[in-house]
Amino acid sequence: MEHIYQYTWIIPFIPLTVPLLIGAGLIIFPTTTKNLRRMWAFPSILLLSLVMLFSTKLSIQQINSHYIYQSVWSWTINNDFSLEFGYLVDPLTSIMSMLITTVGILVLIYSDNYMVHDQGYLRFFAYLSFFNTSMLGLVTSSNFIQIYIFWELVGMCSYLLIGFWFTRPIAANACQKAFVTNRVGDFGLLLGILGLYWLTGSFEFRDLFEIFNTLIYNNEVHFLVGTVCTFLLFAGAVAKSAQFPLHVWLPDAMEGPTPISALIHAATMVAAGIFLVARLFPLLIVTPFILNLIALVGIITLFLGATLASCSKDIKRGLAYSTMSQLGYMMLALGMGSYRAALFHLITHAYSKALLFLGSGCVIHSMEAIVGYSPDKSQNMVFMGGLKKHVPITKTAFLLGTLSLSGIPPLACFWSKDEIINDTWLYSPIFAIISWATVGFTAFYMFRIYLLTFEGHLNVHFQNYNGKKSSSVYSISLWGHEGLKPINKNLSLFTLLPIKNNESFYKNPHGDIKKTIQSFLITNNCDNKKIVPYPHESGNTMLFPLLVLIIFTGVIGFIGIPFDQENMDFDILSSWLTPSVNLLHLKLNNKNSFDWSEFLTNATLSVSIAYSGIVLASFLYKPIYSYSSLQNFALINLFAKRHPKRFFSDKIKNVIYDWAHHRGYIDAFYTRYIIRSVRGLSQFINFFDRRVIDGIPNGLGVTSFFVGEGLKYVGGGRISSYLFLYLLYASIFLLIYYFDFTNININFTDQ
């Protein structure tokens, strides 16, 4: 068995072959490499498949033997300091390796078709392979030095991938925003690593955990110092996993290609923060204040992400806020001490969210054939609707992902999310109520996305191809029904969608549909003009990953279902994670026991809340298919708008939408109070440096220059002039000497 583990070090370097070969090919044979660019998808998929097979073998060994293997090479700098590099194989390593490789392979297959017409095809696959290398190196690291190196490489890859289309200003700004925001967390991570090394004298995880715990238990180090160090480490995870308050980069990161959104923001990069907290869990157990802080950050993030996702027009940004919310569930579980539940939800969410992102990519891909390449249109749900008739496979895949994320049994996320919610009752009833309410929010915003995208009519047919609105039907309210009035662009704090003159929020929602539907649109797609009456299903290489992810979404949740209550390792996941600790169960002296009646009671309530969210979304966003239905709806609306409570509810809706549209005003707060302050300080420092610090030597230099220039013209080359000046200076010197000598004699005489 050990001979398998000893080759684990090669795992991160296998995918690295692809970017090296692509770079060498572009240098040596640039024309041939570019002409045969699609050939590079095959080695990318093949090499990552080899890593997946190796990771699968390691996972099977971990489930059967629970063997932890570590290998270290020591690089001695001097007698007092030794730098060590190595790798660690444990259950957490095997789980993350499986996630990275399985999702990575599917994304590579999907990207071959999705990026086929992009000029940066080779660059895209080089970035993807290098990103996989960085993530695999991160999860196999055995010490903080390697963690930090690969942590920064992951951040660099995310910067390159988010800004892949860097010629678009919005994409360039998004990658800079992600980079700077993550630098804040990375600086905290670096300080925490240095602080722990100062306390323990080691970078190796196993030695560091043992020494730190001993110091805390024996009161050999001040508790505040240890708490500050662990808090700084947690700051790195907050930024990388888009937790409050460093979550602001995640929605803007959707400016990258959709496969990047599936890979980075579903299974890998944003999960790196969860991985770091899980890796440091033995360290956090002895600092309960930090665990409580982690739980607090998690509960704020999951609720904030759910509220912000409820009004998003962009399909990818809505899924990004959803990712932020689900990562909050994982962080909450880790803060409560529910290690198993956090990793369980990490697994189930990765496959479900990858399915949703790739499904949204198929939707965007089909919409681009009609609206052209314009993310503002192809990703805007206002232009969508009725796609279930045109992309049925994508619709089915997206629906299953939506049901899973909403917590509907027996799909994957139901099992993991309910386990977290059950544990919140043992930790804090307030947190349990918030997490339960967020289940309803999750079902609401996910079915809102589904209904606006796939149900009803294709809304892009209600406008001309040149973008001019031909009917009021085009202006679709974000609350579900179409509105006559266009959205007011004069945004204010509480009146994003103002209602004036006692108008109803749903007043006169429809015009004459028969006069607005156009039969077809002529677009320029891939340099070939052709008639594209409706969106079309994506190619097989884009649909195949969806089908595989459907299988994962359906069956992956069963690895955490208990089947034998007599045995402690009663399910695959518990056996995989052995030994693992649930602090909540230890407090109740309830070790690894499972109460099916309690689980079913809590599950029934959570599923009921989820169905309530689905019903609410269906009520607000239910499509209207016939003209008679439009007339009936207008008649109902005529009576409803006269009710005085209607105006109050409309104001509440506008306030909620204003909050979501402005991202909770957190970005505005940062811009006004932090970014402007830092920019003003930078401008002052720049002024002081250039005008004062540089002004002193520059002023002396300029003065010397002009004095020299003046003296240069004093002498004309005549000896008589030199003698005159000599005698003049000598006379002045003698006069000064005479008066000084006279004053000295007078003072001496007076004394």
UniProtKB/Swiss-Prot annotation:
Question: What is the E.C. number?
Answer: 7.1.1.-
**Which Gene Ontology terms of cellular component type are present?**
chloroplast thylakoid membrane
Which keywords, in A-to-Z order, does the entry hold? Chloroplast, Membrane, NAD, NADP, Plastid, Plastoquinone, Quinone, Thylakoid, Translocase, Transmembrane, Transmembrane helix, Transport
Gene Ontology molecular functions: NADH dehydrogenase (ubiquinone) activity; quinone binding
Q: Which GO terms describe its biological process?
A: ATP synthesis coupled electron transport; electron transport coupled proton transport
The record lists the membrane-crossing segments as 9-29, 40-60, 89-109, 125-145, 147-167, 185-205, 219-239, 258-278, 280-300, 327-347, 354-374, 396-416, 425-445, 543-563, 599-619, 719-739
Keyword Lyase on entry: no
Alphabetized Gene3D superfamilies for the sequence: 1.20.5.2700
Q: Which reaction does it catalyse?
A: a plastoquinone + NADH + (n+1) H(+)(in) = a plastoquinol + NAD(+) + n H(+)(out); a plastoquinone + NADPH + (n+1) H(+)(in) = a plastoquinol + NADP(+) + n H(+)(out)
The record's listing under Pfam families reads: Proton_antipo_C (PF01010), Proton_antipo_M (PF00361), Proton_antipo_N (PF00662)
Predominant location of this chain? Answer: plastid
| Membrane topology recorded in Swiss-Prot or TrEMBL | Multi-pass membrane protein
Cellular localisation: Plastid, Chloroplast thylakoid membrane
Tell me the superkingdom of the source: Eukaryota
Q: Which residues form a coiled coil?
A: none
Member of which family? Belongs to the complex I subunit 5 family.
Subunit-structure text: NDH is composed of at least 16 different subunits, 5 of which are encoded in the nucleus.
* General function of this protein: NDH shuttles electrons from NAD(P)H:plastoquinone, via FMN and iron-sulfur (Fe-S) centers, to quinones in the photosynthetic chain and possibly in a chloroplast respiratory chain. The immediate electron acceptor for the enzyme in this species is believed to be plastoquinone. Couples the redox reaction to proton translocation, and thus conserves the redox energy in a proton gradient.
Q: What is this protein called?
A: NAD(P)H-quinone oxidoreductase subunit 5, chloroplastic
Organism encoding this protein: Fagopyrum esculentum subsp. ancestrale (Wild buckwheat)
